[in-house]
């Protein structure tokens, strides 16, 4: 069930049997020459709604405005400060708590969301202690089944941004953008992979200079529509299993 298309009475009825909700979090930022600006949001929303269809879970609207300052050198990117993002998440979660939800499962699609999300959760626990809803944060690509598939299909060319796996999901869910005879991006060193984990990048001008076409070690053009369906199926199945266990804790 989708929260924004549900009635208040339907939510009350849902809460009689389940007090958990899935909150997808994404971003609005460039994703390379063939990646859609809303890629992160599209991925988590598609996976979450598939899970909801199969398991009758409730899904909140995707939080798609997020910290992405490092991509502001590319047209169309919209960025919030980490502080603003954290505050919005806190107020969403507090509102859900007042409705009676005590489990909020965050399905995340954007690495730079992780630090402010975790900070906000600590503050919720500090303020409300045991009354605070329990929060679980999971990147969709970290499900073991999904990660195995990513490596099988793309290996090292999965990279870090504009990944073929996320592009494949948008091809499956929305549309494909083609680019003939595309060259692979510059491969990342182990140091770069370690230092930029969680989208920990420098300022926008520096980032555009280092990654001129927006791809960060990812050969986006390896994505295929069929792959997207495989990723959605695998991720939704893993999400259902983990969500069910979470709400029983």
Model segments located where?
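Extended, histidine- and acidic-residue-enriched regions that form the cofactor-binding/catalytic faces
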Residues: 1-103, 109-249
